[in-house]
């Protein structure tokens, strides 16, 4: 039976001694059920286990597949064991973190080099004071439409294309009910009858 990877939902950690660096990286060992043992947390794991911090394995030379000394105390970690999680991915899927060095060489600095972010904050360039405020984001028709919308929301009368001035409220003809009609809010295109507009 093939051992399950630590990120597999069916993976269960076995109680017992923790494995150390060895030739077989596919053992899937972890400190807890499905928690990744990130190299930056190794000192914490060592302290929590009551054994105290052990000196870091020497970073000189390359790991040649032989088992580390029994007192090294580092868990088995492969490149596949180092990943980032994404809450938008389906459960159990991970984003692999490609290491710049083999995991064994990463122990010396206890730092990982994560990939560059997909989205990063970028400050928009500030307009130069000599040019004034920039309106390059909107085209001419967009500016006209936006100006019209702002005027409508503030209740200002719309400029008409003809040369007719604003409506004169004093010269409105009296309504059939005897009171002066208001040109604001009334639809002049509909015929007014005494049945529908009188109180």
From Swiss-Prot:
Highest rank taxon of the organism: Eukaryota
Listed Gene3D superfamilies: 6.10.140.710
Polar residues compositional bias, start-end: 151-163, 184-199
One annotated GO biological process: regulation of DNA-templated transcription
Main location: nucleus
Entry keyword annotation includes Metal-binding: no
Keyword check for Calcium: no
InterPro entries, A to Z: SAP25
Keywords: Cytoplasm, Nucleus, Repressor, Transcription, Transcription regulation
Compartments, as annotated in UniProt: Nucleus; Cytoplasm
Listed GO CC annotations: cytoplasm; nucleus
Annotated spans, Disordered: 151-199
General function of this protein: Involved in the transcriptional repression mediated by the mSIN3A but not the N-CoR corepressor complex.
Binding partners and assembly: May be a component of the mSIN3A corepressor complex. Interacts with SIN3A. Interacts with HDAC2.
Name used for this protein in its record: Histone deacetylase complex subunit SAP25
Species of provenance: Homo sapiens
